[in-house]
Amino acid sequence: MLKTKKTLLSALAISAATLASASDIKELNFGIIATEKAGAMRQMWEPFLQDMTKATGIKINGFYATDYAGVIEAQRFNKVQLAWYGNKSAIDAVDRSQGEVFAQFVDLDGTPGYYSYLITHKDSAVKTLDQVLQNGKQYSFGIGDPSSTSGTLVPTYYVFTLNKLDPKTHFRVMRSSNHEGNFLAVLNKQVDIATSNSEMTEKMKEKSPEKMDQIRILWTSPLIPRDPLVWRKDLPSDVKKKVQDFVVGYGKNDREKEILKNMYRLAGFKASTDAQLIPIRQLELFKDRMKFESDVNMSAAEKQTKIADIDAKLAALAKAK
C-alpha cells in the first residue's frame, strides 16, 4: 500500500511539473483536412501558419494528411494539437481525440455558412434531381470523404436518406474522393454526378471560370454552419489564449486580408465552442433514426431500444442549445 501511495504521489508530481512547464511549448502541429491536393492546401495555409508562429512565439507546423481520418487520428495521439475540420469531422475530433472547438470561419461576404451541392457536367443528360433519384443505376456517383460534412453527411441525409435510398446501392458505381477530386471527375466526365460545395465552386469561379462554366448544379442543401478550428483540451491555458487571440484578431491589414481571401474567401475567424456542432449532431442522429425505422431485418424490440436511445440524445441536444 505504501509503495502504491509513493508511486501515485510520484506520478502526480510529474504531472504537476509537466503542467507547470507546459507554457514552455516550443512547437505545435496544425492539422489541415484534405479537401484538395496537399500542395494546394500548403499554398493556402502556410502564410497563415507562419504568421501564427511570429505572433505566438511558438513554431506552428502544418500537418497535411491524405484524408480527414489522418488528422483526427493524429490529434487523438497528440501528433496534432490544433486543426481545421468540417463540422462532421470536428465531432469525431471532439468525441475521440480530446478536441474542443475554439474558433469558426467567417466568410468574406458575411454569409454565416456554406452549401453542399450535387453537380454534373453541363453536357450531361442529367438535368434534375428527380432523374438522379429515379434512375440511379444509369449513373456513376462521386461522394466525399466519409468524414466530410458537405461531401457526405449532408447530401446523404437530405438527398438519399429522406428519400429512403442508400447511395452505396442506388448508383451503378460509387467512388469516394475529396472536393477537388470530385469536381475534376465531373469536369473530365469520369463520373456522372458528384457532391461538391459552395467553397469549391466559388474558388473555381474566381480562379478558373472556364471550368466552372462546364458545371451544372443539380441540388443545393440548406445552409451548413461554417467550419470550426479545434484544439486539444489539454493544451495549457496560456497557450490557448495566445492561439485564440491571434486567430480571432487576424485579418486587420491588407496583407492578412489577402491571405484569408485565398483560404476559401474568408474574412477572418470568430470565437466559437462545441455548441456549433449541435445542428450537425442532430442531423447525424436523424439520419440514424430513419435508417433504424426502415430496417426490416431488425427486431421490433431492438428497433424500439435504438430509436429510444436516439430520441434521448436528441432531447439532450435540444436542451444544450
PLM features per residue range, with description:
Residues 1-9:
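Bacterial N-terminal signal peptides that target proteins for export
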Residues 36-37, 43-47, 239-321:
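An extracytoplasmic/periplasmic, membrane-proximal ligand-sensing/linker region
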Residues 69-83, 96, 114, 179-194:
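Short helices/loops that flank or line small-molecule/ion binding pockets
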